[in-house]
Amino acid sequence: MALRAMRGIVNGAAPELPVPTGGPTVGAREQALAVSRNYLSQPRLTYKTVSGVNGPLVILDHVKFPRYAEIVHLTLPDGTKRSGQVLEVSGSKAVVQVFEGTSGIDAKKTSCEFTGDILRTPVSEDMLGRVFNGSGKPIDRGPVVLAEDFLDIMGQPINPQCRIYPEEMIQTGISAIDGMNSIARGQKIPIFSAAGLPHNEIAAQICRQAGLVKKSKDVVDYSEENFAIVFAAMGVNMETARFFKSDFEENGSMDNVCLFLNLANDPTIERIITPRLALTTAEFLAYQCEKHVLVILTDMSSYAEALREVSAAREEVPGRRGFPGYMYTDLATIYERAGRVEGRNGSITQIPILTMPNDDITHPIPDLTGYITEGQIYVDRQLHNRQIYPPINVLPSLSRLMKSAIGEGMTRKDHADVSNQLYACYAIGKDVQAMKAVVGEEALTSDDLLYLEFLQKFERNFIAQGPYENRTVFETLDIGWQLLRIFPKEMLKRIPQSTLSEFYPRDSAKH
């Protein structure tokens, strides 16, 4: 306490007074002191020593004891207030990243207050149903959030030993995902898309339809009130933001949704903190309120480009395509904040959306994302051009946690075998289609023609479905069997004989 009081005197602030240790109001006073100490840090000193402005960065000289990641409040000559964060410290110099941009900052007249605290965001269960900007300020004309807690936006590190392996399948109602790339609760799986493709519609459909597989009471959590969606938009246009907002309102789920919107005309630098604000809110809802949270992050390509802009302003050595060398680590600090924790009922499932520049899956953003996440859902332009919705190409798509989320007791015992056989038949069908373009249909064998028929029916009946068509995983598997009956039993080599004898002869007239 004495040390803190001395530090306050050195920094120009009033020293903290000791709290009396007796009496009925001791608990309340101690709590008030804890709150003021941790969250309402008073500015230490005000500086007018801005020596330069470079892009989103402000450089200050003659700063006493600047600290890394410290929050700085800037006051412009016209009284406008902005906030920033210390990115780099060298002696008495500090490089500050300004979240709202640096336009209008006068080097001689701008004053900077160092708060002595890190960036924290107020969190509360009341944030559900609200809309915030990319800095976490309400933009829905509602009141300021009455905070239950103030949390560091970088999150708390989770002990790997305390993580629980995701094993409960989330039913999205989309056959291409549920049947062949099943998502587990607590998984991180991105949607790899490109400009002009319906990735927003797919994400909205997942939000509308997501729920646990309805199997039996000992497996399924039937309660819907503990489900929440946190949606973070980075660099999207107003049309996309309005699409998601109106979709949530129309299906009646807006009360369970928290939106963070950084639009294309908002400051680029703000995109660095938007996903972290969203994930901090999601962690509070999951681990404190014990809700099952689905986090949608769009567009991660805009986030990575904002990261590149800051890196270029700091004159760091660029990596591939000009992106910083630490982009892999930076993306991991976002994606790894998904999962389940022992002793908590809640979970965080992440579905980041990224648009691949020039449809290039080898671009650094999708390339590094694929290394970190547990699979990907690939949205294909060729399928989209043929009017197939959702245009999900199952061949490059993958779910690494599918094996533990399906099977007897979770979905159905034939799930894995049907998925493997559908993959094999579709891959062979694609090869036959390519061969047909070279040699013509007359040169194909009878088996080849069967694969070609399967290919067309698979895309038309299995992949294609309506945007409001919600298929159960059992309906999806039945459609899969209906397609596999195109082939004689002998050609279905990926399915064990016992499974074939049980499911293959079923009457498919009801489908």
From Swiss-Prot:
Tell me how this protein assembles.
V-ATPase is a heteromultimeric enzyme made up of two complexes: the ATP-hydrolytic V1 complex and the proton translocation V0 complex. The V1 complex consists of three catalytic AB heterodimers that form a heterohexamer, three peripheral stalks each consisting of EG heterodimers, one central rotor including subunits D and F, and the regulatory subunits C and H. The proton translocation complex V0 consists of the proton transport subunit a, a ring of proteolipid subunits c9c'', rotary subunit d, subunits e and f, and the accessory subunits ATP6AP1/Ac45 and ATP6AP2/PRR.
Subcellular location(s): the record lists: Apical cell membrane; Melanosome; Cytoplasm; Cytoplasmic vesicle, Secretory vesicle, Synaptic vesicle membrane
Q: What does this protein do?
A: Non-catalytic subunit of the V1 complex of vacuolar(H+)-ATPase (V-ATPase), a multisubunit enzyme composed of a peripheral complex (V1) that hydrolyzes ATP and a membrane integral complex (V0) that translocates protons. V-ATPase is responsible for acidifying and maintaining the pH of intracellular compartments and in some cell types, is targeted to the plasma membrane, where it is responsible for acidifying the extracellular environment.
Write out the entry's keywords from A to Z: ATP-binding, Cell membrane, Cytoplasm, Cytoplasmic vesicle, Hydrogen ion transport, Ion transport, Membrane, Nucleotide-binding, Synapse, Transport
The name this protein carries in UniProt is V-type proton ATPase subunit B, brain isoform
Residues at which ATP binds: R400
Q: How does it sit in the membrane?
A: Peripheral membrane protein
Q: In the record, what terms sit under GO molecular function?
A: ATP binding; proton-transporting ATPase activity, rotational mechanism
Q: Which residues form the signal peptide?
A: none
What does the record list as coiled-coil region(s)? none
What is the taxonomic lineage of the source species? Answer: Eukaryota, Metazoa, Chordata, Craniata, Vertebrata
InterPro entries cross-referenced by the UniProt entry? ATP-synt_VA_C, ATPase_a/bsu_AS, ATPase_F1/V1/A1_a/bsu_N, ATPase_F1/V1/A1_a/bsu_nucl-bd, ATPase_V1-cplx_bsu, P-loop_NTPase, V-ATPase_su_B/beta
One cellular component term (GO) for this entry is: cytosol
Q: Which GO terms describe its biological process?
A: ATP metabolic process; synaptic vesicle lumen acidification; vacuolar acidification
In terms of domain of life, where is this protein from? Eukaryota
Tell me the organism: Pongo abelii
A Pfam family assignment: ATP-synt_ab
